[in-house]
Amino acid sequence: MEQDNGTIQAPGLPPTTCVYREDFKRLLLTPVYSVVLVVGLPLNICVIAQICASRRTLTRSAVYTLNLALADLMYACSLPLLIYNYARGDHWPFGDLACRFVRFLFYANLHGSILFLTCISFQRYLGICHPLASWHKRGGRRAAWVVCGVVWLAVTAQCLPTAVFAATGIQRNRTVCYDLSPPILSTRYLPYGMALTVIGFLLPFIALLACYCRMARRLCRQDGPAGPVAQERRSKAARMAVVVAAVFAISFLPFHITKTAYLAVRSTPGVSCPVLETFAAAYKGTRPFASVNSVLDPILFYFTQQKFRRQPHDLLQRLTAKWQRQRV
């Protein structure tokens, strides 16, 4: 809910509109979204360009990472509208269709990132815990592209109702763009919002934790293969586990906890406006964490992929050497 509202609360019903003091959104969301745009846009473009340049040697993890970067790029391209909106004191001048599209992109990126990170983690789990099994190697990159197609279809199906519930409205003689739904639809939105959290976050999160618990047990076993190659493999898997867990903890967990609490409170009859405002502020205050995911994902890519991490350094060395030769 993205607005300072009027002051109507029917007895025995959830508060439909309350006066919110939300100056913090202009002070918090505008600079955070600006940083995500300025940093995340070029980073994700670089990730996409590097993966496409290496398309002949793509691994399945790289295919998932490419789709992850595409989701982040689409979201970053929608940020200028939100930055303008919050910089003008939460006034939305772009129309109802743009409002619905921007809200859809946010949640599509959010849940797409969760699912693609889960795919990357599961791929890592198979390589560590079932390295000799052939059943998961069939199909190669083609199978990975099929999985990505299924993920995109699932994300679209999950998040499409967001574009239905999101809408513009008039508050205090200005047009606003509701994030979840107009206040009058709060009880109708609740089942969908809870289902989206369970299916789009909780279940993938549990699957990811299960994968990494199994991987940790396997990597800590003393009877595993020895040698520098095996040690590097263990180290790489450990880095991936720590970084992905950090991404989930920073980007997704606070947002979904506060969102779930806010959805429950705003649909509860008899809740006072000050209480609702407190939960709304907590929810909206964690939204930047979810947006920063578009910056953390490409950093995760460079942190865990040594081959791609060397490419910018090698390119810089070649350009420097060429520039020095031209000076001679």
Swiss-Prot record:
<dbReference type="GO" id="GO:0030321">
    <property type="term" value="P:transepithelial chloride transport"/>
</dbReference>
<keyword id="KW-1133">Transmembrane helix</keyword>
<feature type="transmembrane region" description="Helical; Name=4">
    <location>
        <begin position="145"/>
        <end position="165"/>
    </location>
</feature>
<feature type="topological domain" description="Extracellular">
    <location>
        <begin position="84"/>
        <end position="101"/>
    </location>
</feature>
<feature type="topological domain" description="Extracellular">
    <location>
        <begin position="166"/>
        <end position="194"/>
    </location>
</feature>
<dbReference type="GO" id="GO:0045030">
    <property type="term" value="F:G protein-coupled UTP receptor activity"/>
</dbReference>
<keyword id="KW-0675">Receptor</keyword>
<dbReference type="GO" id="GO:0019103">
    <property type="term" value="F:pyrimidine nucleotide binding"/>
</dbReference>
<keyword id="KW-1015">Disulfide bond</keyword>
<dbReference type="InterPro" id="IPR000276">
    <property type="entry name" value="GPCR_Rhodpsn"/>
</dbReference>
<feature type="topological domain" description="Cytoplasmic">
    <location>
        <begin position="123"/>
        <end position="144"/>
    </location>
</feature>
<feature type="glycosylation site" description="N-linked (GlcNAc...) asparagine">
    <location>
        <position position="173"/>
    </location>
</feature>
<keyword id="KW-0812">Transmembrane</keyword>
<feature type="topological domain" description="Extracellular">
    <location>
        <begin position="258"/>
        <end position="280"/>
    </location>
</feature>
<dbReference type="GO" id="GO:1905835">
    <property type="term" value="P:cellular response to pyrimidine ribonucleotide"/>
</dbReference>
<protein>
    <recommendedName>
        <fullName>P2Y purinoceptor 6</fullName>
    </recommendedName>
</protein>
<feature type="topological domain" description="Cytoplasmic">
    <location>
        <begin position="49"/>
        <end position="62"/>
    </location>
</feature>
<dbReference type="GO" id="GO:0070374">
    <property type="term" value="P:positive regulation of ERK1 and ERK2 cascade"/>
</dbReference>
<feature type="transmembrane region" description="Helical; Name=3">
    <location>
        <begin position="102"/>
        <end position="122"/>
    </location>
</feature>
<dbReference type="GO" id="GO:0071415">
    <property type="term" value="P:cellular response to purine-containing compound"/>
</dbReference>
<dbReference type="GO" id="GO:0001621">
    <property type="term" value="F:G protein-coupled ADP receptor activity"/>
</dbReference>
<feature type="transmembrane region" description="Helical; Name=5">
    <location>
        <begin position="195"/>
        <end position="215"/>
    </location>
</feature>
<feature type="topological domain" description="Cytoplasmic">
    <location>
        <begin position="216"/>
        <end position="236"/>
    </location>
</feature>
<feature type="transmembrane region" description="Helical; Name=6">
    <location>
        <begin position="237"/>
        <end position="257"/>
    </location>
</feature>
<dbReference type="GO" id="GO:0045029">
    <property type="term" value="F:G protein-coupled UDP receptor activity"/>
</dbReference>
<keyword id="KW-0325">Glycoprotein</keyword>
<keyword id="KW-0297">G-protein coupled receptor</keyword>
<comment type="function">
    <text>Receptor for extracellular UTP &gt; ADP = 2-methylthio-ATP &gt; ADP-beta-S &gt; ATP = ATP-gamma-S. The activity of this receptor is mediated by G proteins which activate a phosphatidylinositol-calcium second messenger system. Functionally coupled to phospholipase C.</text>
</comment>
<feature type="disulfide bond">
    <location>
        <begin position="99"/>
        <end position="177"/>
    </location>
</feature>
<dbReference type="InterPro" id="IPR017452">
    <property type="entry name" value="GPCR_Rhodpsn_7TM"/>
</dbReference>
<feature type="transmembrane region" description="Helical; Name=2">
    <location>
        <begin position="63"/>
        <end position="83"/>
    </location>
</feature>
<dbReference type="GO" id="GO:1904707">
    <property type="term" value="P:positive regulation of vascular associated smooth muscle cell proliferation"/>
</dbReference>
<keyword id="KW-0807">Transducer</keyword>
<keyword id="KW-1003">Cell membrane</keyword>
<dbReference type="GO" id="GO:0005886">
    <property type="term" value="C:plasma membrane"/>
</dbReference>
<keyword id="KW-0472">Membrane</keyword>
<feature type="topological domain" description="Cytoplasmic">
    <location>
        <begin position="304"/>
        <end position="328"/>
    </location>
</feature>
<comment type="similarity">
    <text>Belongs to the G-protein coupled receptor 1 family.</text>
</comment>
<feature type="glycosylation site" description="N-linked (GlcNAc...) asparagine">
    <location>
        <position position="5"/>
    </location>
</feature>
<dbReference type="GO" id="GO:0032962">
    <property type="term" value="P:positive regulation of inositol trisphosphate biosynthetic process"/>
</dbReference>
<dbReference type="GO" id="GO:0071380">
    <property type="term" value="P:cellular response to prostaglandin E stimulus"/>
</dbReference>
<dbReference type="Pfam" id="PF00001">
    <property type="entry name" value="7tm_1"/>
</dbReference>
